[in-house]
């Protein structure tokens, strides 16, 4: 099953996508956070045959949920209504954007270049974290 990772933000939404074996996450696309975003994600889910969606839940460092997490949950609820066949998972995304910034700097990307893809890379880190947890669960069950 393929997974879609979503890094939800007020202005932009970063997307990542897994391979068909759900082993590796790849940056996919950045969308504007506007009225058309649900329809666009629905098209992507259908076109890429996505079975599950992992939405980043930006928890505070103490583990509590703040305003950004509430917005992400509300977005996930809207997405669940728009795409009822997809499994929706919320996943802790603390520090994924910081990690994405570090990775892009290490790859030699400047701030201007990074701005175009940082949300995708954050979504990739988020989704890869979830996929890794699935792999650990499967290994533990054997």
Predicted regions and their residues:
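Phosphate- and other anionic-substrate recognition elements at nucleic-acid/protein interfaces
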Residues: 2-6, 10-11, 16-142
